[in-house]
Amino acid sequence: MQLPDGPTVVPFLHSLKWRGRYLEFLEWCERRYGGIFTYKKFGSRPYVVVSHPQAIKEIFTAPSKYFDSGKSNQAFRPLLGNKSLLLLDGNEHQRQRKLLMPPFHGDRLRTYSRAIEDITQQEISRWSTPQPFVIRSAVQVITLRIILRVLFGSEQELQAQALNQCLTSLVNSFLSPFPWQLLFFSRQKQQLDNLLYTQIQQRRQQGNFSSPDILNLLLATRDDTGQLLTDEEIRDELITLIMAGYETTTTTVLWSLYWVAKIPEVQEKLVAQLKALDSNLNPTAIAALPYLRAVFSETLRIYSITGFTFDRIVKIPLKIMDYEFEPGTVLSPCSYLTHQREEIYPLPKQFKPERFLERQFSPYEYYPFGGSNRLCIGMAFAQFEIQLILATILSRLHLSLADCQPVRPIPRGINLIPPLKLQIIAAQR
């Protein structure tokens, strides 16, 4: 098998040369080697990085039998558990995905809208101050409260303060670049497990699953054979949903607020569209506003949450464009590079929501939530939630940056986040 060309310098030397310039390194590789190139990470098998839309299409449309996708996510097993949807393949993955899809689509979204709006309003009432403040911690409070309300029905039921402290410590340890932080990981994970298993067992004993929170839905769900989910399966899916609804949602809201605070024209256009609505219009209509959707989409284009979708490990010999890949080859679809292709997105470094009003992009040109049977099950909910948060904030507050200097995304685990100390100034409209 002849792998695509790629950098041949020792990975350690690459790390020194491109230190702190992760995205620039990817762009350099694509310019030099094209939309499919091989990168050899130190101590691991080669990775084939894929950004060409035709290659992405061939990966996403290939039957799932060609890949072991869950196997590529094993690094998350210590955090997410053995039964997390992200780690499963084959029939087991298909079963879990089918069971977990309903809470995040259709009428279920509307049941969450009041919680999203109420929590956001409560928290931003503390933002109006002439002094700059660090926006990350303020947004984290909103997103954590929302995911707790959606998952458990009440923030108090799960001792939200204890969960907040435990979850924050656990995420920081798991994502930290410093190995000694992992010394605390096992103890923090055990504390979180105790909280979750206690809640699961208490709900089972009550036997009343009528409220629409996701824990109740998971407890009441049966598969095609009539089998209920086990406590372990529910725990692992709760952790997966918390991580998705907390860290990645926080990152997307932060980038959205950064761009609307940085570009006054974008902010004022959004506000004008919100003001044109009837104040009693339902949240579903607010989330469907064309320019609001365009701002959300452009935010995820310019800095995709992770930069990559989850890897696929080839299980059966497979041809992608002109390359034959043998079992064991790791294919890494790179959404960041695809979203920066100038022939698809002219002036790709500029934040231009209008591009999403002018044309519709294919799922192989724009895929911030992945694709195929690995498309994020929470995509519809994430878009609905984030757009409601933005609408609630901007209808009440005018935002500006404390420092107008351009910022660079920072790799944090698999996420590309704004600077931790990014400051915002919020004023009442």
What are these regions (language model features)?
Residues 1-3, 68-77, 108-251:
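Cytochrome P450 heme-thiolate monooxygenase catalytic core
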Residues 1-95, 110, 114-122, 347, ...:
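N-terminal membrane-proximal hinge/A-helix region immediately C-terminal to the signal-anchor transmembrane segment
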Residues 3-9, 113, 117, 165-169, ...:
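Cytochrome P450 I-helix active-site segment
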Residues 14-34, 194, 198, 281-321, ...:
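Conserved cytochrome P450 K-helix E-x-x-R motif and the immediately C-terminal K′/meander segment
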Residues 26, 95, 239, 283-284, ...:
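Cytochrome P450 heme-thiolate "Cys pocket" and heme-binding signature region
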Residues 30, 120, 163-166, 275-276, ...:
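Cytochrome P450 proximal C-terminal region
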Residues 248-273, 380-397:
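Cytochrome P450 catalytic-core helices
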Residues 333-359:
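Conserved cytochrome P450 K-helix/beta-meander segment immediately N-terminal to the heme-binding cysteine loop
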